[in-house]
């Protein structure tokens, strides 16, 4: 039997989330996840983008990956003092100001009928809206990519009208 120890195991949830404080979790030995407090919205995401710009210049950082109102930071080496990393991330979060990343508009064709719209009747039943109303509401919105997914070309979008949200 091989005995091992994990000095990060007790720090799985290093800083709990509060109304105004970000949450930092240890994700393995070299990675930390900062989650923005509050709602999933553009305000929080813009601060995540600003934080990503700030930490990208840290000499000891291998990579930073912005997610949906969170930021994963991966260090080159296992940090000697995880608490210092947490403090550093929280300080950077507190100093992060909202930025708006420039992008481009991409029009995505949507097929609302036939074999591609198998969930449309269920959405109409859940929302109480007609199929025409669902299509109109969905089509009128402008969606913003908050983060890139793990599959090529997959973006996590924000901006769905709550009337057509389906769990």
What would you call each of these model-derived segments?
Residues 1-167:
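Conserved "landmark" site that anchors the functional core of diverse proteins
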